[in-house]
């Protein structure tokens, strides 16, 4: 079994904002990574598809507040930006 990808290194090129914001994005990205790994056995964001992030945002977070879901959406957009797939979200 391979070692999970280091999210801090993975997101280092797209993380902006204050230190607290960066830490929140990293924490949330690791939570997303763990949930997607548990559901689909994909711990590497390079193998993720849009359906994985949509599942996380709609199903995994369905019992969370709107504010929580909003902040996770921001983190998901950062992940998608890092993957170079932003155009897929627009279509």
Question: Regions from the language model: what does each represent?
Answer:
Residues 1-21:
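Short terminal alpha-helical segments
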Residues 15-88:
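Non-catalytic DNA-binding core/recognition domains of DNA-processing enzymes
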